[in-house]
Amino acid sequence: VEPFYAIKSNPDPMILYVLSKLGSGFDCASKDEIILAKSTGVPVENLLYANPTKDQSSLQFARSQDVDYLTFDSYCELDKIKLFHPDAKCIIRIKVDDSGSECKFNSKFGCTMDEVQELLSLAKIDKINVVGISWHVGSNCKIPGQFSKAISDARKVFNIAKEMGINIEIIDCGGGFPGTDDGPI
């Protein structure tokens, strides 16, 4: 297991520097977050551009910075990747049950399980290298079983990909466990 810290959760440069020196990778959602992560000296292979909706300039920027790991959840995104970062290593983001979380993401991010096979087929036809599966149970998830359900869904995607000759090497598990609030720090 290799941690990839979501910069959006706390972009303090000192925290990022320490995490980088401890060997953490970084989950980036924007050009600015890529720049911030790279300023820590982290190797580019430890950067994931995890925003599933990227514009042309963002994809070109990622490519110019050798940031190759990208997420996608639609054919529109695959089409942009094919045009502007064709050598990317792509990670399909799936919707999972986030009903136990305070901050939900699945209404706006991730493809449904019914869309997985078609998206993987289109990626294969377009010669887009799919190397992983991503999901996010939402922030502050209070139902541990949601993680098990998400892992089960990821396994289904893994099996579909395997049948298609796609080698999945990465599973990006998103979401956070709630901590305790014992007062001010």
PLM feature segments, named:
Residues 2-170, 179:
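Active-site-proximal beta-alpha core segment in soluble small-molecule metabolic enzymes
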Residues 175-179, 184:
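A conserved active-site cap/scaffold subdomain adjacent to cofactor or substrate pockets
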